[in-house]
Amino acid sequence: MDFKYSRELKLESLDALNLTEGIPLRVNENIDLEFRGIERAHSDWERYVGKLNGFHGGRGPQFGFVSACIPECLPERMETVSYANEFAFLHDDMTDAASKDQVNGLNDDLLGGLDFTTEARSSASGKQQMQAKLLLEMLSIDRERTMVTIKAWADFMRGAAGRDHHRGFSSLDEYIPYRCADCGEKFWFGLVTFAMALSIPEQELELVQRLAQNAYLAAGLTNDLYSYEKEQLVAERSGTGQVFNAIAVIMQEHSVSISEAEDICRGRIREYAAKYVRDVADLRAKNELSRDSLAYLETGLYGISGSTAWNLDCPRYQVSTFVDFKTPEDETAKEEFIHVPEQKQFVGDGSIEDQTTEGNQEIVLRKLPQMSTEVIEAPYTYVKSLPSKGVRQRAMHAINTWLQVPMAKMKLIEDVVERIHNSSLMLDDIEDSSPLRREYPAAHMIFGVPQTINSANYELVLALNAAHQLGNPTCLQIFIEELQRLNVGQSYDLYWTHNMITPSMNDYLRMIDSKTGGLFSMLSRLMVACSPRTVSADFDSLSRLVGRFFQIRDDYQNLVSAEYSKQKGFCEDLDEGKYSLPLIHALETCVNSDRDMLRSLLVQRRVAGHLTFEQKKLVLQIMQRCESLEFTKSQLCVLQTRIQEEIDKLVAEFGDENFSLRLLVELLVVG
């Protein structure tokens, strides 16, 4: 690996330990940029989350954690990477003193900012605002590698990040795999590849991550060696009594003292470091890996020496500098699963339980309890349990950063929007004859058309009831107005398809404004009506633009996205005969021969009820000749710019930045 941004540093104390197999210590030349990132993270934490009171993170007396562990971090990325690492240290300290449920709640809070399929737990927290600010900064520098980082970070938050800290381990061998994951292996993979602008080829990824584990284990156990005293103190003060640390595990397994456990731990560190040095040397000699993969693995070498040198004298693990870190109120994580309710056996008289009328001549006069809602809610419960992008819910919580709607009313508004949205999906799938919903059978393919329609209608009644519970007559009026708009919009969508009428682009946009935009309009209007703040800001334009962006993005992805094909079928909109923006553009702009061919294909779809794979490919070829897909993508770019401008206006109106909302829009950009 070429060295452009680092220098070798000799530390006698490091050499005396004999832990790093002679791996030289290299430190990035831009330590000032690292410290600037640390200071900025502290400032933002105090602004968005709370007071730090003497917190110590990545800063050491001579150099910082990032400078020593990623010595070849690009200078223009150092401050951002340092901010990200400090944010991770801050979060880590919160989880150290937390109960198991608190740890899960804290992790789910951050996971919610990374993974749209995770349920949004509350309004965008201060930590989510910091996280969104960081990711927006990273996206502006390098979108491709930031997306890798987001996925890696989400995987880490989902499966590790302290979730096993309360588990007991009977041996070091049992503890080791968990320590490898918990030391931030996945998060660090994303951060290193971003810091150095590395792209690991897909075919090498599994090998690279497997080989790197010895480096992470050496670094993780070194951290255990130096952090044990602090973590023991945290456990005592918090009352958890459980220390997630190799020293504690070794002491219990071998019934030895702290110093003896430390010696055993040092032996394991040397073992992992030596194995890693040999592996990297072999890889260099074979010269079979890509340049970027080898650079990532070589960085692991300097991560071993760098983390050891940093641990030696960093204030973070000195008990004399330790301060308690407060955790927020307990928030229990919610497990998600696909739910298909067990079907009860029905008997001839329509009752669920097998009852007998023998000896009961006056049964018709009995006063009986109301029937259960289990049957009518079964299709809705199924649709609700399917994987969801969850974008509307996240948009609500991001907007609530400004509006500060009380949580009880937010839950009701969420209930209104979710019931209307999912009931609309159930009816849409029937009206469009769609067999799939997010890779799973559509509700009517399981429960039948009549039962699904009845369930969807029932959910609209429950949505009305939730709107009524908001206790504001304005909310009921908003509910009625927007539900009317939504159904009017759907009527035109169905009318055009049934009668094979090509709408103008203006009419198509008006339909979107009523249908897709109507749901965004409903949620923003309900939130404004329930806000304790005096709100003069207008969300109508933002709702309209976001609705158009969502629908047109869906039009585009339906035709080009492999993920959409997996979830809904290849070019499903063409099977349904729906008029999308790309199709309308093609019909308006194609040469006569292509236009006639498109119309003939639409007729064939109506006759057969679908298009063949080959027919769909032909439609796509015509669209490509007409540049309809390029046109659609350009319109998405226009909408994204206008949405950010609308956010700018709202930021000026409220006087507060909204990083969560900006990040939400940025992550939906079509690549």
Curated annotation (Swiss-Prot):
Transmembrane segments: none annotated. Mg(2+) 4 binds at D428, D432. It catalyses: 5 isopentenyl diphosphate + dimethylallyl diphosphate = all-trans-hexaprenyl diphosphate + 5 diphosphate; all-trans-hexaprenyl diphosphate = talaropentaene + diphosphate. A motif (NSE/DTE) lies at residues 223-231. Its EC number is 4.2.3.220, 2.5.1.158. The keyword Coiled coil does not apply. Mg(2+) 1 binds at D92. It comes from the Eukaryota. Signal peptide: none annotated. Mg(2+) 3 binds at D428, D432. Pfam families: polyprenyl_synt, Terpene_syn_C_2. Dimethylallyl diphosphate binds at R437, K515, T516, Q551, N558, K568, K578. Keywords: Isoprene biosynthesis, Lyase, Magnesium, Metal-binding, Multifunctional enzyme, Repeat, Transferase. A motif (DDXXD 2) lies at residues 428-432. PROSITE patterns: POLYPRENYL_SYNTHASE_2 (PS00444). The keyword Repeat applies. Its cofactor is Mg(2+). GO terms for molecular function: lyase activity; metal ion binding; prenyltransferase activity. A motif (DDXXD 1) lies at residues 92-96. Isopentenyl diphosphate binds at K389, R392, H421, R438. One of its GO terms (biological process) is isoprenoid biosynthetic process. InterPro entries: Isoprenoid_synthase_dom_sf, Polyprenyl_synt, Polyprenyl_synt_CS. The conserved DDXXD motifs as well as the NSE/DTE motif are important for the catalytic activity, presumably through binding to Mg(2+). Bifunctional terpene synthase that converts dimethylallyl diphosphate (DMAPP) and isopentenyl diphosphate (IPP) into talaropentaene as a single product. The C-terminal prenyltransferase (PT) domain of MpMS catalyzes formation of hexaprenyl diphosphate (HexPP), whereas the N-terminal terpene cyclase (TC) domain catalyzes the cyclization of HexPP to talaropentaene. In the N-terminal section; belongs to the terpene synthase family. This is Talaropentaene synthase. It comes from Talaromyces verruculosus.
